[in-house]
Curated annotation (Swiss-Prot):
The keyword Cytoplasm applies. PANTHER family: CANCER/TESTIS ANTIGEN 55, CANCER_TESTIS ANTIGEN 55. Plays a role in spermatogenesis, possibly acting in the regulation of the autophagy pathway. This is Cancer/testis antigen 55. The lineage of its organism: Eukaryota, Metazoa, Chordata, Craniata, Vertebrata. InterPro entries: NA-bd_OB-fold, S1-like_RNA-bd_dom. Keywords: Cell projection, Cilium, Cytoplasm, Cytoplasmic vesicle, Developmental protein, Disease variant, Flagellum. It is found in: Cytoplasm; Cytoplasmic vesicle, Secretory vesicle, Acrosome; Cell projection, Cilium, Flagellum.
Length: 264
């Protein structure tokens, strides 16, 4: 139950750049302070009772009509609500498109894309489920996956062979955020701007720098399910250290920030 609560808070408490969250352009249906849109998309990830459509629309299993179990790759019709306070898109109704309307899809060999959540990591492999894993050697040296990270895995399959061969791995989203404040530090873990999780076990820091509360920093972060957060910092660079006497000017500890997309 606690895990489901964390997922719910993570998916539905999402914060992102408004420019990043623009969905397909369809006719909107105004309703109060919300904007309803009907689109067709593809399920790109599913974890527990929550998932993503087209990597941009979050949904929970209770909005799927007929309680039909969903799988990655299924086409769906979606009624989408714009969550203005969090600059996000949330599905309020999901209808599965009957498979006979769009065919069975290719069954031969070829390159495909899988969206998955890291469940565990050892010295050699990264697991995104109990049965799907790949070598850590194919991951870019600039990015070290961590448990909870959401990854886009490009892989190939061959007829008659049940396992997959991953050819590339990258985070599904990477954002660069400038001049944000470290709001808490507890042991080896901390939070930036109340929304971005970090751990000293997996973050790039300048030599000799130790993150402290009230430090103003630039951050590179990836989408990741971490407790009640959906962003994980993979790089932290100090702009103003709290020990230097920096004080905010009434901004309540939340300096103005600028976000832009950045690929890894």
């Amino acid at each position: 139950m606690l895990r489901l609560l964390r997922l719910a808070l993570a998916f539905y408490g999402r914060t992102a750049d408004p420019a990043e969250r623009q969905g397909p352009q369809q006719q909107g249906l105004p309703q109060g302070d919300t904007q309803l849109t009907t689109v067709q998309g593809v399920v790109t990830s599913f974890c527990g009772d929550y998932g993503m459509i087209d990597e941009s629309i979050y949904f929970s299993s209770d909005v799927v009509t007929g309680n039909v179990p969903l799988k990655v790759g299924q086409k769906v019709n979606v009624v989408v609500e714009e969550d203005k306070p969090h600059y996000g898109l949330r599905a309020i109704k999901v209808d599965v498109v009957p498979r006979h309307l769009y065919g069975a899809g290719p069954s031969d060999s070829g390159t495909r894309v899988l969206i998955g959540c890291v469940t565990s990591i050892n010295e050699d492999n990264i697991y995104i489920s109990n049965s799907i894993y790949f070598s850590i050697a194919i991951v870019s040296e600039d990015f070290v996956p961590y448990k909870g990270d959401l990854l886009e895995v490009e892989y190939s399959t061959e007829p008659g062979i049940s396992n997959i061969k991953a050819t590339s791995v990258k985070p599904i989203r990477c954002i660069h955020t400038e001049e944000v404040c470290i709001t808490s530090v507890h042991g080896r873990n901390g939070v930036i701007d109340y929304t971005i999780f970090f751990t000293l076990d997996s973050v790039k820091l300048p030599d000799g720098y130790v993150p402290q509360v009230d430090d103003i920093v630039n951050v590179v972060m990836v989408e990741s399910i971490q407790f009640c957060f959906i962003w994980r910092a993979i790089s932290i660079t100090p702009v103003h250290k709290s020990s230097s006497g920096f004080q905010d000017d009434g901004g309540l500890g939340r300096p103005k920030r600028e976000r832009r997309s950045q690929s890894i």
